[in-house]
């Protein structure tokens, strides 16, 4: 997928250099990250950074963290976790994340 892939909101989705490096290192593809952004199973706001955290559940959960920047969404990192409930509970309990969807 190219950087002009659109989110469900109609906004263009781009990836930071860090996100691209993380996807290569973690053997993840853009399509999976875009799917997480477009169709998350759960959505959170990181209160520290103001970024949106999209969680897409499968065998392992894919987490895509992104910013809304003017006319586009910029994915800043992507990772998989085998323990999404533990991650989410910890972030919510510490007040780092709030559920938005």
Locate each region found by the language model.
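Ribonuclease/tRNase effector modules and their secretory precursors
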Residues: 1-101
